[in-house]
Amino acid sequence: MPLAALPPELAGLRIVHLSDFHLGIPSRGAVAVERAIEWARRVAPDLVVVTGDLLSRPRAEPRLRELLGSLRPCYVVLGNHDVEHARDPFSRSAGLSDLSPARLLVDEAETLELRGRRVQLVGVDPRSYRTGRSRPWLLADPTAELRILLCHYPTVLRRLPADSFHVVLAGHMHDGQITLPLPLPRRRVLLAHPRAAYASGLYVRNGISMHVSPGLGTTFVPLRFYARPEATELVLERGRR
């Protein structure tokens, strides 16, 4: 992920981005989550970030805590399925709050030192985002040399003032989950979120770089088609955006 004005010390910084576990409902996604966590432990990145929709049923909360507790340092935000804003009739909110030792950010910020530089993480709560009350740029610290916003919804990118953050990490979209390939290069019909502007991958807007995770789990139906689950390692580089 190339970033303009990235301090030399932060070049090569590795961030593992995970999203949309949807644990609690039997599916191949649960296996993907287990494998992704094992892989993340093995690659030992500088930072692990999880961008919401952790559970589809509360019964998986103990296992979720075990998985997140094995990742250090780990920062988390909630998604709509975690706070009862899901249309999936099989989903039930677990009312998650504290996830220690993982750090859950609920409309709050935390600054840490990585490689001798100040890195700020700001987390958006899905409840305030959906009601339009969220103003994450007001939490941004202009003295931080790298500002990272965590939000379940990738559409947050449209709301951000230019250059308020360097990086946005989001999920929610499942890369369509079930898609139909078209006889054109890199073209598909996304059955989930068919008009999505940000389905998965890298985007740039107003000087801000965003990665949208395809996620690992599933909702409504326990399968994916032409929308593979993914755990992503992002490596920051100096360069033009």
Description of each model-found segment:
Residues 17-34, 55-56, 84-91, 182-195, ...:
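Acidic/histidine-rich helix-loop elements
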Residues 3-16, 102-103, 110-122, 142-146, ...:
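Beta-strand-turn-beta hairpins that frame and shape the catalytic cleft
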Residues 1-45, 60-62:
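N-terminal signal-anchor transmembrane helix
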Residues 154-235:
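Conserved beta-sheet core of the metallophosphoesterase superfamily
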Residues 86, 91-103, 110, 114-151, ...:
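Binuclear metal-dependent hydrolase catalytic cores centered on His/Asp/Glu-rich metal-binding motifs
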Residues 23, 54-57, 80-84, 110-112, ...:
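Solvent-exposed loop/turn segments at secondary-structure junctions
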Residues 16-19, 47-53, 74-80, 105-108, ...:
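Active-site neighborhood of phospho(di)ester-bond hydrolases with catalytic His/Asp-centered motifs
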Residues 30-113:
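Core catalytic region of metal-dependent phosphoesterases/phosphodiesterases
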